């Protein structure tokens, strides 16, 4: 319960405040209007506010031309619950893992994965690993090709950076069919 509450708090309280209209480049007008309304609701009239809520962050990652700002909001999203503050989830994660191990052992299983998989089609972790490896072998060449194509897009448009997760959504939105 505490884990989810911490994640929710960090999602609900983060604000990326933009005060330079140039930083809105690439964003659709509707997204900009919503960010202006969010800013107004937060007492920041004349600015634009983006949050970690999906209707705000997703179009920002997809359309914003400013890579540094995309990186900033992306990092805030993936780092929720891991900041050095009262909402850090590391202790909660450790406790959850410990309790899962205890539960599994009390029920006669060597570990939590064995407990969960016992009632599933996979039956055991070895079968899961085999399936994952088969998928991995098929997906890896395709993923590498896709990464090469996206890096070519970056290079072609004068980008001086290597492909990173923060750029994926943006590049996909701007690629030509």
Where are these regions (language model features)?
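His/Asp/Glu-rich acidic catalytic environments and adjacent acidic regulatory segments
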Residues: 1-123, 138-142
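Generic hydrophobic/packing signal
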Residues: 116-118, 127, 173
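Zn2+-dependent metallopeptidase catalytic core
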Residues: 128, 132-143
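Carboxylate/His-rich catalytic cores and anion/metal-binding grooves
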Residues: 139-154
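Single conserved hydrophobic/aromatic residue that forms the stacking wall/gate
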Residues: 170-177
